[in-house]
Amino acid sequence: MTKALIVVDVQNDFCEGGSLAVAGGAAVAAAISQHIVTSSYDHVVATRDYHVDPGAHFSLTPDFIDSWPVHCVAGSPGASFHPELDVSGIEQVFSKGRFAAAYSGFEAENDLAGWLTERGVT
């Protein structure tokens, strides 16, 4: 069996100090890095929120359901992976949400499901 780990959106804007911070995000990033080192996956991939112009997804008065504060803007520090996440073992990054909201790596512009299937991950 071919095993893969999908690391989901471990970005600065979702960790402490970011525009949509989750408490403990930096610790999670470090724990994921350690997990990658101590586990045996055939493939490690990551997703990232990477907004170019997501339309109504951003709002100055977000409802936190359909609209959100500005976050993970393409090329910004907030869109970068958190420094506690060691990206050296990540084989492929799948960006999502460039021009519309996307909440799953399987919605990404790149074909995550196809990429995994091509490598025998089921």
Where does each model-flagged region fall?
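Alpha-helical scaffold elements lining the catalytic groove of polysaccharide deacetylases
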Residues: 97-119
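Active-site beta-loop-alpha substructure in enzyme catalytic cores
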Residues: 122
